[in-house]
Amino acid sequence: MDLTPTLDAIRVFCEERDWRQFHNPKDLTAALSIEVAELMECFLWKKADELTLTIEQNRSNIEAEIADIAIYLFHLVEVLQIDLPAAIDHKLEHNRKKYPIEKSRGNAKKYTDL
């Protein structure tokens, strides 16, 4: 998946509106958190057996909220000059040690409870 055109589009969108002045790490993080909360709201009070229908009926809104999350996350990564693939690789390696397969496979417990 080549995200370069998407990342460029996000950058251009913000530059055209002169929004970089507002996009500091604190505010981008707050915006990201708010968008995650809006995604959570799509599923609020739904029982497990209602989720399939909820997703089907609200797919466009769910997609829009996920897009908002991605936009703010990618913009935050750019502002902080983070190599996201490298950060993900590092975090996965860290989590491999915390969640060894033999203890965590099929288990939802936190690493401190394994």
Question: Where do the protein language model's features map onto the residues?
Answer:
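Flexible "arm" and connector segments at domain edges
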Residues: 1-66, 70-114
